[in-house]
From Swiss-Prot:
Pathway: Carbohydrate degradation; 2-deoxy-D-ribose 1-phosphate degradation; D-glyceraldehyde 3-phosphate and acetaldehyde from 2-deoxy-alpha-D-ribose 1-phosphate: step 1/2. It is an enzyme of class 5 (isomerase). It comes from the Bacteria. This is Phosphopentomutase. Mn(2+) 2 binds at D289, H294, H342. The keyword Manganese applies. Belongs to the phosphopentomutase family. SUPFAM superfamilies: Alkaline phosphatase-like, DeoB insert domain-like. Keywords: Cytoplasm, Isomerase, Manganese, Metal-binding.
Length: 395
């Protein structure tokens, strides 16, 4: 690892679902007109995001309330998703150099009877639910029945996901996790090919149920080497914050830091800014998506964006001359769009280091994989087959 890197530490923030306007192929995904950031800003009469403004957010495209500064600090552009799909795993895998041409399977009418029957047989518990639903809504609807009968609540969403909810006093966590491992085994390959199985434990009484932080994701393993694998294999640190380790099924991770919220994620990111390491610190801020996007809550989403922006004041001054900060997203989830699903959008890209003498526009990126290619280029590890590094464009 005696390699001279341009930047010793790279900090990558994925603002989960913070899209910046419809992608060219949005119509194919029934997402014409989707615009996560733009619509939230309009709904609120403007967003107060002075730190993102300084970096150059409104230079990518104007966001109401976020002024265009004369000299943005960051290099800025937007990125197009090359893969088929608009889910978390597809977006994150592409960021690290994989392209998914065959989208993970989705189950808009619930899972096939034969899969549910096999899950019941293998776990010894009946299944209730088996439909697309909001996680909070389905535990309100079926939580009481679950507590009386011990049947597990299975549900899905517009994503490729099989979620299993259970009360922690009815189905102990170790049993719930074991059930999810069985579900993962059953849906790993065709004909089901589910991207993620998620344990969704909750507590409380009927009418006052609350999901706990003991969620656990069981993702498919990435089907090729990611940039994270290359970094780890070369002896660099890869610190995964939030659900990053779950998304990549722990592939290429040297240290995993769990989080309970966006703000906890920012706390953990700030902690890593104080650590002495060479490599990547990679955080996913899931609340934008899980708490506000899917629930179509533009007010809450806007509040969360402003809270995130305020926390950048803890991040920017701690960056050293040989640090690089990359802020982006994995897909859109426009809270004023129809339905409750993700939206096919461009995502913002802001790239900053204290050594920059001001930012400039970068060309629009044709794939999220340009981020992974740039990180690989910086640490001089094998680059992924997809993606073009923009490292040389950062003066």
């Amino acid at each position: 690892m005696n390699v001279k890197t341009t930047y010793r530490r790279v900090f990558l923030i994925v603002m989960d679902s913070v899209g910046i306007g419809e992608a060219p192929d949005a119509e194919k995904y029934n997402d014409k007109g989707a615009d996560t950031l733009g619509h939230i800003a309009e709904y609120r009469g403007g967003l107060y995001m002075p730190n993102m403004a300084k970096l150059g957010l409104s230079h990518i495209r104007e966001i109401k309330g976020v002024p265009k500064v004369e000299r943005p600090l960051a290099y800025y552009t937007k990125m197009k998703e090359a893969s088929a799909g608009k889910d978390t795993m597809t977006g994150h895998w592409e960021l690290m150099g994989l392209r998914i041409d065959k989208p993970f399977r989705v189950f808009p009418n619930g899972f096939p009877d034969e899969l549910i029957a096999e899950l019941e047989r293998r776990t010894g518990r009946n299944v209730i639910g088996n439909k697309p639903a909001s996680g909070t809504a389905i535990i309100e609807e079926l939580g009481e029945e679950h507590m009386k009968t011990g049947a597990i609540i299975v549900y899905t969403s517009a994503d490729s996901v099989l979620q299993i909810a259970a009360h922690e006093q009815v189905v102990p966590l170790d049993e719930l996790y074991r059930i999810c491992e069985i579900a993962r085994e059953l849906t790993r390959d065709e004909p089901y090919m589910v991207g993620r199985v998620i344990a969704r434990p909750f507590i409380g009484k009927p009418g006052h149920f609350e999901r706990t932080a003991n969620r656990h994701d069981y993702a498919l393993k990435p089907f090729g080497k990611t940039v994270m694998n290359e970094l780890k294999d070369a002896g660099y640190e890869v610190i995964a914050i939030g659900k990053i380790a779950d998304i990549y099924d722990n592939e290429g991770v040297t240290q995993s830091l769990r989080t309970t919220s966006n703000m906890d994620g920012m706390d953990k990111l700030v902690d890593t800014l104080g650590m002495d390491f060479t490599g990547l610190s990679f955080v996913n801020l899931v609340d934008f998506d899980a708490k506000y996007g899917h629930r179509r809550d533009p007010k809450g989403y806007g509040d969360a964006l402003e809270e995130f922006d305020a926390r950048l004041a803890d991040v920017l001054p701690r960056l050293k001359e040989d640090d690089l900060l990359i802020i982006t997203a994995d897909h859109g989830n426009d809270p004023v769009h129809h339905g409750t699903d993700h939206t096919r959008e461009y995502v913002p890209l802001l790239v900053y280091s204290p050594r920059f003498r001001g930012g400039k526009p970068l060309p629009v990126r044709e794939t999220f994989a340009d981020v992974g290619a740039t990180i690989a280029d910086n640490f001089q590890v094998n680059r992924p087959p997809y993606g073009t590094s923009f490292l040389a464009d950062l003066a």
